Swiss-Prot record:
This is Phenylalanine--tRNA ligase alpha subunit. It comes from Bacteroides thetaiotaomicron (strain ATCC 29148 / DSM 2079 / JCM 5827 / CCUG 10774 / NCTC 10582 / VPI-5482 / E50). NCBIfam families: pheS. It is an enzyme of class 6 (ligase). It comes from the Bacteria. SUPFAM superfamilies: Class II aaRS and biotin synthetases, tRNA-binding arm. One of its GO terms (cellular component) is cytoplasm. One of its GO terms (biological process) is phenylalanyl-tRNA aminoacylation. Binds 2 magnesium ions per tetramer. The gene is pheS. PROSITE patterns: AA_TRNA_LIGASE_II (PS50862). The lineage of its organism: Bacteria, Pseudomonadati, Bacteroidota, Bacteroidia, Bacteroidales. The keyword Metal-binding applies. It catalyses: tRNA(Phe) + L-phenylalanine + ATP = L-phenylalanyl-tRNA(Phe) + AMP + diphosphate + H(+).
Amino acid sequence: MIAKIEQLLKEVEALHASNAEELEALRIKYLSKKGAINDLMADFRNVAAEQKKEVGMRLNELKTKAQDKINALKEQFESQDNSCDGLDLTRSAYPIELGTRHPITIVKNEVIDIFARLGFSIAEGPEIEDDWHVFSALNFAEDHPARDMQDTFFIEAHPDVVLRTHTSSVQTRVMETSKPPIRIICPGRVYRNEAISYRAHCFFHQVEALYVDKNVSFTDLKQVLLLFAKEMFGTDTKIRLRPSYFPFTEPSAEMDISCNICGGKGCPFCKHTGWVEILGCGMVDPNVLESNGIDSKVYSGYALGMGIERITNLKYQVKDLRMFSENDTRFLKEFEAAY
């Protein structure tokens, strides 16, 4: 009898059921009126008197453990069933919403890729800058309008600290710490103290380029600009350079491209001129080179800079700059096929 009880105890401890039907079969096998434990209870009357106490205790232990094991398995199945309450397995799955790249990111990466193929590497710098790297090192006079609080965000407690107004500050940091040849592009966000409207914003994105080496000429700059325009806007794109002024370049120019909407024939977008301005450029002023520790008698260079929002406007005919920062998913989904 003791041997049979020990054998059943081992079986009970190892009980396992994969579903409710298997559990019910185990209950019937061990705990029903015709079950194995009840059969042992019926044989208990035949146990010798001196063994009845020990056998009775072991039988009660077996029955208790079997009942506890069956109950534990039952609770396990019930908890699994409750976890699915309210779950309609026949309902169609929700569609998976895929994210898309922001149009500014798409165009910025395209600009970077074009210049990377020309051998330019990416350089980055802080958005919170000091006056030296934003203005003084770039040949801005003390009374230059860009230093005015109406154009630039200054930190009130520290007037020498500003939010950078252009990524040219990255160029000055690279020139301070690197020796020519220098061939970099500087993508990033910049800030201007301007009223927000359909054509202006208090922050926007720029990509600037700098090349400093021996015997760099304006011809080199023009060739890079032409290649960039054709890669960005199509092989039929034409460019023209108009004289301009920037404190950090001399000579300086504004670059226009033939309107990619009307093909240069004239339309409302280009104000019927056939041309659209996209960037500023020029040869690096010798004073800027000297301010950053580069001998202007040995080295020369060119710089150019463009607003990414402006380029994006031209590529996708977006008429309101504010749309780029409003996170309207209806607008952003229109660019799913743009990359």
